Amino acid sequence: MRILVVEDDPEVRSAIKMVLEAEAYEVAESGDGADALAKLRVSPQPSLILLDLMMPGMNGWQFMDEVRVHPGLRQVPIIVVPAYGSADGVLSVGATDYLKKPFAPETLLAVVSRHT
């Protein structure tokens, strides 16, 4: 199962990758929305996307807009992983679920397993 992690903080991205790879998930990484879209055009479709909202360049909101209109990607589950504030509204604009930071590895795995 392939998961795309879109997160601008390299430490958070690395921690998520480590937890997922320990459970035999294949992980692709991206530091912003534009890079993630470019990877989606040339890489195999992920089974799930973990998405930060606040990123430089193309943020998570803009990324979701792009993914949800793409015929080959609109059904891929997106789990939003916001750092600050609430996740209000993310489900109505294309997110499948959300997981607020900070989170325990067990919580991350539970949310991911619900959607894979």
Regions from the PLM with identified roles:
Residues 10-28, 115:
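Two-component/phosphorelay signaling modules centered on CheY-like receiver
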Residues 29-48, 90:
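Acidic, metal-coordinating helix/loop segments flanking the phosphotransfer/catalytic sites
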Residues 52:
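Active-site residues of response regulator receiver
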Residues 55:
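Receiver (REC) domain active-site loop signature in two-component systems and cognate sites
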Residues 79-81:
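Hydrophobic/aromatic residues positioned on beta-strands within the core alpha/beta folds
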